[in-house]
Amino acid sequence: MKTSIEYRDPLELSEELAKLGQLTKITQLEGGSGFYTMQAANTNKVALAEISANKTLLYEGWGNGITIDFNWITPKANTQGAFGYCDGFKMTKNSLAGFGTINSVPGNAWGKYNNECSSTGCMLEKQLLFELLENCKAYDGLERLTGDQGIYCNNKALNQLKRLAAREVSAGIQNPEKYFDLVIACLEEPMTEQNSQDPKHIDQLREIINLAHSEKTMESPLSLLEVCKYINTSQASLYRICQEYFGMGIIELMTQIRLEESRRIMLNQDARRKLKLYSIRDIAIKYGFKHQGRYARRYYTAFGELPSQT
């Protein structure tokens, strides 16, 4: 299945991912309309999704509690540095990440990818993967999977995994057992300083993402001081983290996410009725915008139309 969509906002992509059981919220971190392509394939034990976009996108809520969703990127250009982050793990051409989806709580993972790469998710049934790891005594792999966010692979297995997925995401999955074998081979690669990464800021980053999407705090126009208190960090540290990982400040990030969520609810008439959000003003207040005029201006800047035109 291949989907190509030119969009004004990334809600359509969320809907496509929902068909794979991923209730993922997506925020575009730069202005203007976008274009993305998505290819997907699945069998009983394995699902694949390859996404390419011309805008930087933030994904929140990935993971269904049943599968472990291994992620990697394929560069479109020879660029130095990170192409994005998966649960805070830096994504380069040798990265394999997404280990945080081992958590049984759905929607616990996040990722951010720029427009210079495509990202691929390989979703393997968790119970079967654990059985295979234990049966072949892959104890190093088990330790990495349960203790790390990702690894850098320098063996042939990751390249083979990428080639297999690139072929079968469009042609259909023919060798589901091969994905388990190759992932285990990646996890069992001997540990070196080159393929390990200190998980600095992992917990803080997850708190930032959770706070930005929290329905409990969505109605409150949080100040920078309140955000720092919630995350238990200094303004200087929070600024450095957000600039490094998101390319913007925390308030700007939260504002963009709230705009996306307000648009999501504005386009869903059933949800509006259930929440008793009968007017644009009701929706603006629900998502922390107390001044309707400012909300309308920010909405127009983000989506190219006024709330009344949606």
Please give the residue ranges for each predicted region:
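Alpha-helical DNA-contacting segments of helix-turn-helix folds
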Residues: I241, Y245-E261, I265-M266, R294, ...
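Short polybasic/polar patches that bind polyanions
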Residues: N42, K229, E244, I285, ...
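A short acidic, glycine/proline-enriched capping/turn motif at secondary-structure boundaries
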Residues: N54-L58, P75-Q80
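Alpha-helical bundle regulatory/interaction domains
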Residues: M1-S33, F70-W72, N78-M218, S223-L225, ...
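Helix-turn-helix DNA-binding module
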Residues: L238
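Conserved short histidine dyad/triad with adjacent acidic residue
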Residues: G32-S33, M38, N42, V46-G65, ...
